[in-house]
């Protein structure tokens, strides 16, 4: 998965993308509802000279959760401290982070659903009362001391919101669902990024890159850089529609934004399991991927694009999936699925 051109996760090659990130809400493209709400909440907090209420961003990876955390810190004129659920192993780790914050700072915890439950409980008074409870001593001699914390904002990010405990989820004042971007929004992101990279690109080429980016800005920027490389070598450096298509075809990212692994999943359901239903564990074993990887990385896009459907009995290929491979689905009298070449 790490070598996939269309993986939504951050990879080593994406470091250049940090310079492409917008720093204000005005520059931010997409997520209109989230953006509109944040704009109001930030302005209201600044008007009252208060810290912003705690925010939870949830949705598939690569949709801008970290970028929005940076923007919130900038808008609130605070510092951003970044960590992740798995990185906070001990209560002392979290206590050290919390006591290092100042007013209006933003603490961003990625993969917050992976926080240890005992560590999570330390966050409860920190989020509600801006206080940290520390236990000194052991046994009968133990006593609790409460330390006041600065007025900070906690921003949590998760791809698995259902795994968050209710007590933690309920302490967030704002819950923001991150959605896949439209092709038009991704085109605008590609145009903006190309300008920052000093690359000339026509809007048709930018749209083609956006269309194949699986609704994800991180992928769009990654594909833009690879198309830039191709056009630097094969063309005069400018990116036109022909060059973009040739580069993307060479990268084996098809017109629907699917790569080899996506097609492998669809082929397995259609040709090996007669269109489904097939259980997720069986499917994961068959294609050699982790169950969580399929559920978190591949499925959201395939479902969003209408290629597969979730049912109580398992995953089922849609008519669109059959059309993608140029075959038709015919329901026989015994309800078995047969496949005929067109």
Curated annotation (Swiss-Prot):
Any single GO BP term: DNA recombination
Any GO CC annotation of this UniProt entry: Holliday junction resolvase complex
Positions of region (Small ATPAse domain (RuvB-S)): 182-252
Annotated spans, Head domain (RuvB-H): 255-342
Catalytic activity, reaction form: ATP + H2O = ADP + phosphate + H(+)
SMART domains from the UniProt entry: AAA
Residues annotated to bind ATP: 20-21, 62, 65-67, 128-130, 171, 181, 218
Region (Large ATPase domain (RuvB-L)): 1-181
Record flagged with keyword Cell division: no
Subcellular location: Cytoplasm
Molecular function terms from GO: ATP binding; ATP hydrolysis activity; four-way junction DNA binding; four-way junction helicase activity
Keywords in alphabetical order: ATP-binding, Cytoplasm, DNA damage, DNA recombination, DNA repair, DNA-binding, Hydrolase, Nucleotide-binding
Residues binding DNA, per UniProt: 310, 315
Family classification: Belongs to the RuvB family.
Function: The RuvA-RuvB-RuvC complex processes Holliday junction (HJ) DNA during genetic recombination and DNA repair, while the RuvA-RuvB complex plays an important role in the rescue of blocked DNA replication forks via replication fork reversal (RFR). RuvA specifically binds to HJ cruciform DNA, conferring on it an open structure. The RuvB hexamer acts as an ATP-dependent pump, pulling dsDNA into and through the RuvAB complex. RuvB forms 2 homohexamers on either side of HJ DNA bound by 1 or 2 RuvA tetramers; 4 subunits per hexamer contact DNA at a time.
Recorded domain comment: Has 3 domains, the large (RuvB-L) and small ATPase (RuvB-S) domains and the C-terminal head (RuvB-H) domain. The head domain binds DNA, while the ATPase domains jointly bind ATP, ADP or are empty depending on the state of the subunit in the translocation cycle. During a single DNA translocation step the structure of each domain remains the same, but their relative positions change.
Subunit structure and binding partners: Homohexamer. Forms an RuvA(8)-RuvB(12)-Holliday junction (HJ) complex. HJ DNA is sandwiched between 2 RuvA tetramers; dsDNA enters through RuvA and exits via RuvB. An RuvB hexamer assembles on each DNA strand where it exits the tetramer. Each RuvB hexamer is contacted by two RuvA subunits (via domain III) on 2 adjacent RuvB subunits; this complex drives branch migration. In the full resolvosome a probable DNA-RuvA(4)-RuvB(12)-RuvC(2) complex forms which resolves the HJ.
Name of the protein in its database record: Holliday junction branch migration complex subunit RuvB
């Amino acid at each position: 998965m790490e070598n996939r051109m269309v993986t939504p996760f951050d990879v080593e090659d994406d470091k250049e993308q940090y310079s492409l990130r917008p720093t204000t809400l005005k520059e931010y493209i997409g997520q209109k509802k989230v953006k509109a709400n944040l704009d109001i909440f930030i302005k209201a907090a600044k008007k009252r000279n208060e810290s912003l209420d705690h925010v939870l961003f949830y949705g598939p990876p690569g949709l801008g959760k970290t970028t929005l955390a940076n923007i919130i810190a900038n808008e609130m004129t605070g510092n951003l401290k970044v960590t992740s659920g798995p990185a906070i192993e001990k209560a002392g780790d979290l206590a050290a982070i919390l006591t290092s914050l100042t007013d209006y700072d933003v603490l961003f915890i990625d993969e917050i659903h992976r926080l240890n439950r005992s560590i999570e409980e330390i966050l409860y008074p920190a989020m509600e009362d801006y206080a940290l409870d520390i236990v000194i001593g052991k046994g009968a001699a133990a006593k609790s001391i409460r330390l006041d914390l600065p007025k900070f904002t906690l921003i949590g990010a998760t791809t698995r919101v259902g795994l968050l405990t209710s007590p933690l989820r309920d302490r967030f004042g704002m819950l923001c669902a991150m959605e896949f971007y439209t092709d038009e929004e991704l085109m605008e992101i590609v145009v903006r990024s190309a300008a920052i990279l000093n690359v000339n690109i026509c809007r048709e080429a930018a749209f083609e890159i956006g269309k194949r980016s699986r609704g994800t800005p991180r992928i769009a920027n990654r594909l833009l850089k690879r198309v830039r490389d191709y056009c630097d070598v094969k063309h005069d450096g400018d990116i036109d529609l022909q060059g973009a298509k040739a580069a993307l075809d060479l990268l084996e990212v098809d017109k629907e934004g699917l790569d080899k692994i996506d097609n492998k999943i669809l082929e397995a359901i259609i040709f090996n399991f007669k269109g489904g239903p097939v259980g997720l564990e069986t499917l994961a074993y068959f294609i050699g991927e982790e169950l969580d990887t399929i559920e978190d990385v591949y499925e959201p896009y395939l479902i969003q694009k209408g290629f597969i459907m979730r049912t109580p009995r398992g995953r089922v290929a849609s008519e669109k999936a059959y059309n993608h491979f140029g075959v038709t689905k015919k329901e026989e009298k015994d309800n078995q699925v047969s496949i005929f070449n067109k």
